[in-house]
Regions:
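Interdomain hinge and pocket-entrance segments immediately C-terminal to HTH DNA-binding domains
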Residues: 84-91
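Residues within the DNA-recognition helix of helix-turn-helix
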Residues: 29, 36-39
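Alpha-helical residues within the helix-turn-helix
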Residues: 24-25, 42, 63
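Short helix-boundary/capping micro-motifs
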Residues: 12-27
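The DNA-contacting recognition helix of HTH DNA-binding domains
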Residues: 4, 30-31
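Short alpha-helical "packing" element that flanks the helix-turn-helix/winged-helix DNA-binding module
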Residues: 6-13, 65
Length: 91
């Protein structure tokens, strides 16, 4: 099963291409970033990044997941927005 927190870490790592920068952005340590990505790769049964001398680069599977994860993120934000607005109108 895919964990939303793992996807959030994946999105940050895809954006920054650095575990340190992704961790700083999410306010978690670099080791946690690595563990979350490893858990996601294990859940999916596939590596998501190629490790190069220039850092981390999304591979083909990672690029597919990135598109889908962005859609999930947008949907979650929309759910939060619509339920928050509804809660405020019912108070």
């Amino acid at each position: 099963m895919i964990d939303w927190d793992d996807l959030r870490v994946f999105l940050a790592l895809a954006k920054f291409a650095s575990q340190r920068s992704a961790g700083k952005y999410l306010e978690i340590d670099q080791a946690t970033v690595g563990r979350r990505i490893k858990a996601l790769e294990t859940a999916l049964g596939s590596k998501l990044f190629d490790r190069t001398s220039d850092g981390l680069v999304l591979n083909g599977t990672g690029q597919i997941l990135l598109r889908q994860a962005k859609q999930v993120e947008d949907q979650i934000l929309e759910i939060e927005k619509s339920t928050s607005a509804r809660d405020q109108t019912h108070q």
